[in-house]
Amino acid sequence: SAEQDIAARLGELATFPTESPKTLESDIRVLELTQGFEYAPLQREAIRLALSSRVMVLTGGPGTGKTTTVKAILNLYEGIYDRVALCAPTGRAAKRLTELTGHSASTIHRLLEVDYSTGSVRFIHNEKNLLPFDVIILDEMSMVDAKLFQALLAAARYHCRIIMVGDADQLPSVGPGSVL
């Protein structure tokens, strides 16, 4: 099932060795000084986890600082990773993510590239043609169904970091199997 595949793949990714930057605390402090505010303790913990884990879930209600935390993570990733993808399940959510973070975001379907030549929904990026990203940040995770997330994980490189962002109390996925 899709759920079992997702659990297995996230488990594989989570066990891949990772190392957080030795200067992480000072990097966070420099970011705070540059932006003119301090992160809340839970935001700092989320930032630390994003740089020390392969798989992370960042969840919270509206106005809890998820986007601010994602922006901090993106800023810190810039010096480490060349290929970071931001995506969301809908065009509207991807556009909003681009506006709020200043980084280009796409839909998950666009990231995976739909292959229209087959007559059914297949993706160009899959387990045989992996996505080129070191990090994939998925926003509005509550709206992502199990099949789409399964396809994304199958196309992710074996050492990719996956950050899932969302609000469990928001709109559920239209398709079966709400991931968040």
For each of these PLM feature ranges, what is it?
Residues 1-180:
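Conserved ATP-binding/catalytic motifs of P-loop helicase motor domains
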